[in-house]
Amino acid sequence: MIKQTLRNPALRKRATQFGRLVRHSAVTPRQGQTHKPRLVTNGELGITFIGHASFFVQIGGKNVMIDPNFARWLFVLKRLRRPGLRIADLPAIDLVLVSHAHFDHLHRPSLRAIVQNNLRTRGVAPSIIIPTHVSDLVSDLGFSEIIELDWWKSSRHTNLSITHVPSRHWGARILKDSHRGYGGFVLKSGKHSVYHAGDTAYFSGFSEIGRRLSPELALLPIGAYNPPQFRNVHTNPADATKAFLDLKSQWMVPMHYGTFRLSHEPVDEPLQLLDQEAKAAGIKDRVVVLEEGVTRFF
């Protein structure tokens, strides 16, 4: 494999570029603070950004973790911002949602630690909701229930419904398991609803998600778009702005930026470009940039 890479100019270029990412991550000081979560009262919706695509969501009387990743390193890539919360400080978690099997979204050590923390604090493990054909990756982690959903299928948990929705991405964890599902989730309870897009490129499905489920708040990815071909599977800030307008949501919370150096745009660029795009679209007052670990109530 190494000899093949050295002989192939395209592979050699990619290896050189990846080496730059690794070196930049290694020498960049880790930033950010860890906080303790604030808990909701009076039926509020609570959103806590942990970093990357990870969120602690309080909705419908349930505590939900989405794509939890507390890793200090993603293989050779150093985490650039600390997780906003510690697993030990979490309240008992009812549900864990994982959007797809990629290593930065389905992080097995974090999932196992959440289960173990739940058993200590509550005596019962949480349930997990995943796309189709992903259960084998989480079956040994101790969850009380494993629920696989296909696109547009829903799972109900007392007053909370969770619907798995399409995205434009792919689900393989390694090269040979492209059968695995992928997508986003819409959580709805009473007057509150949240859409977590997972990983996705811009596509016409945003309009359909908005039309069918009308999410109040959209958690949308804005990073990992350079080189340009990455936009086949990721949204840049302009794409995320268009997606938000298609969804017709009230609030947008950006994610998938600044935590791991997954691509070649400057670390600070996604938020800077999002600010420009939001101003141009007249939605700046509806974009809420969350500090890791600081709970926002809606």
Annotate the PLM regions.
Residues 1-28:
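Membrane-proximal basic amphipathic "stem/tether" segments
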Residues 30-40, 50, 56-101, 105-116, ...:
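Pre-active-site segment of Zn-dependent metallo-hydrolases
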Residues 46-49, 63-67, 161-167, 193-199:
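Active-site-proximal beta-strand elements of phosphoester/diester hydrolases
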Residues 57, 67, 100, 107, ...:
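Divalent metal-coordination and catalytic microenvironments
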